[in-house]
Structures are given as structure tokens and as C-alpha cells.
From Swiss-Prot:
Catalysed transformations (reactions): UDP-beta-L-arabinopyranose = UDP-alpha-D-xylose
Pathway: Nucleotide-sugar biosynthesis; UDP-L-arabinose biosynthesis; UDP-L-arabinose from UDP-alpha-D-xylose: step 1/1; Cell wall biogenesis; cell wall polysaccharide biosynthesis
UniProt cross-references to Gene3D superfamilies, sorted A to Z: NAD(P)-binding Rossmann-like Domain, UDP-galactose 4-epimerase, domain 1
Annotated active site: Y220
Name the UniProt record assigns to this protein: UDP-arabinose 4-epimerase 1
Keywords: Carbohydrate metabolism, Golgi apparatus, Isomerase, Membrane, NAD, Signal-anchor, Transmembrane, Transmembrane helix
Its job: Acts as a UDP-D-xylose 4-epimerase but lacks both UDP-D-glucose and UDP-D-glucuronic acid 4-epimerase activities in vitro.
Gene Ontology cellular component list: Golgi apparatus; Golgi cisterna membrane; Golgi trans cisterna
Amino acid sequence: MFSFGRARSQGRQNRSMSLGGLDYADPKKKNNYLGKILLTASLTALCIFMLKQSPTFNTPSVFSRHEPGVTHVLVTGGAGYIGSHAALRLLKESYRVTIVDNLSRGNLAAVRILQELFPEPGRLQFIYADLGDAKAVNKIFTENAFDAVMHFAAVAYVGESTQFPLKYYHNITSNTLVVLETMAAHGVKTLIYSSTCATYGEPDIMPITEETPQVPINPYGKAKKMAEDIILDFSKNSDMAVMILRYFNVIGSDPEGRLGEAPRPELREHGRISGACFDAARGIMPGLQIKGTDYKTADGTCVRDYIDVTDLVDAHVKALQKAKPRKVGIYNVGTGKGSSVKEFVEACKKATGVEIKIDYLPRRAGDYAEVYSDPSKIRKELNWTAKHTNLKESLETAWRWQKLHRNGYGLTTSSVSVY
């Protein structure tokens, strides 16, 4: 950068003279000044010319074009707990991955780890964006050639949804509409949608099949069902391949210890039971709160189907591989067996080796007594079966990551490439 300021030691005879509010500069100084401007302009023009001659100047990013044999997957919410594990699995399977996340719940450091694991050009890119911004989403689709979308991005806490229902309808239902409209506009033909067993509500008959009536009882489940309805209505007159995965309670982490669950501290009261157990075991919280002991179950606490995140992302990859144009697949993703909250806590005590203090509290709004899946359809049609079905072992895997990451990922935006 050129400096056009005068030195302080300059003589008075070379200074501008002011008269009547006008400056009359020394002609020699004026010529020198103009010469510098011309030199700068010439150098700039030369640089631009040379840059344009570079073979890479007009070469589009590999992410912006389709390539034979390469499947480019947009993973929304890919900086989050489940989304990052899905991105890891896709990258291991040689997919090209673009992560889009607004980082309201996700962790940039998870993206950095993925970038370090797969540094080769054209493997992974991260785009900071909010799916509620339709213009930003359209720009992303315009600049990238996606073959499929895995839509994970969503707020996902039952308790929080009862406190802030409008937030959930905006974030889940409205944002899914934006994604679907943009996919249609840009000819992206495959959607794998991350849904939830919360769309079923509290069925009278267990286990839950895909034919079980959907009667959600909280805004989270209702918002997800609305999003499903939008997708299903659109698919009736579209050649899009659609897979909807309704999964149950997610636990565990990457068996190799690269990724884990690191929710924001302010969301602890709404978080998963595994996170609450680990917080109590590490002394972050004084104990574990069990909300509700008067449900109509064997021990009075809620019964849930706990699915390991490794099995869950395996189901997503199989769904992607099996997706067919003009077809909609709807699948429950669970183990097929339920465990009570008390049983879960006992497994957590064994996994951590800590005698966790338990406080029993009244029920949490929007919860239901018993939910577990019948996974026979996904087993038959996608050849998928949960392999990590031992609660204690899944919790031990997650606990190892927690012990090594006492502050979560503990990294900032300066540590990751953001586009």
C-alpha cells in the first residue's frame, strides 16, 4: 500500500497555501502525486491481467459441478451432534460433503476435526448460513452442485419446545419448507429427512410401527410432523426420492473418539439424559434429576428406545443408497427394545464408575410414558439392524470422549475454514 502523507520535517515552502477556503498545491507535488496514482493503477491492471491468464482463474470449484462417480451430499446441521457423525461416515465412504450450519447448536470444532481428517481438496466444505434465510439458501444451491440432501438441522428438545413453540415451528417446519422449495428449484432429487418418534405422541400399543397413528403431544413432535406432511404432499407430484427416518433416543459417540456430544451449557436443562448423567458424574452438576416417577411403567419412570449414533448414521447412509426416484420410504430407526430411565441411570453409573446422586422431581411437560420401536421394516427393506444395543457399552464409548473433552470441543471460529 502506498503512503501519500507528508513527512513532518517537510519545509514550509513545500506546503500547500490556503486562500479563501481553497488549497493551491505545489505543482511539483501535484505531479508526483499523480505519478504515484498512475503507477498504482498500472500495477493493479497488470496483476489483474496476469491473474486472468492463470488456468485456475475461471475454473469453478469442484463443489460447483457434478462429477461421474462422486455423490455430493449437503448435510444441514452438520456441525451438530448427529449431523457431524453423519458427515464423518459419508466422508469415510468417499462422498463429497458440504456442511451448512448456523452454529446456534452446533460446534465449529467438530467441523475442524473433519477437515483435518479429510484435508484433500473437494472432500469437505463448511458454509455458515441460516436455513431460515431463503436468499442465502438459494445462493448456496446456485453455487454448488448437490446430488442429495441430508436434512438434520433442527432444534430438538421436547421441554424447550413447550416453552418456545413458535421457535420450533419456524426452525423445523418453516426451514424444511425453504430447503424443499430450493431443492425443487435447483433439481436436487434426493432427500433424506431426519424426523423423530415424537411424531407418534403416546400410542396405546407398543412397539411402534410405521403404521402407528401420528398424534404428537408437544410442539417438537408437531413441528416435525408438519414438516413430514409438507414433504409427503410435495412428493405426490414429484420425481424426488424421499426417505424419512423417525428415530428414537440417540446416545453414544464415535467409537474412535474423534467426535462426541457437546451441547451448550445453557441448554443442559433441556438436554439428553446421557449428557445429564455425564454432567453429574463429572461434578458439573450436583446430581441427576429424574423427572417423573409415576408413569404407568414397571418402575414408574419413562421407557425409551436408545439408539447408538453410530447405528443411526449407518441407517442414513443405507437410506441414501436405497433411495429411488418417485418413491417415499418411511422407517423407524431404533433397537426394538425399551429401557426405563432408572435402568439407564444404573447403566450410566457402571459406565462412569461414579455413584451419581439422584433427585426425583415431578413430570416434565410434554413427556410420555413409554416409547420403543418395531424396526422390522427397515431391517427388511434396507438391510439395517442396530448393532450397538448394549446401553453400558454405548455409554462407555461416550464417557471416554467426555473425559478427554472436559470443556467440550473447546475451539473457536479462528480454528476452522469458514466459507
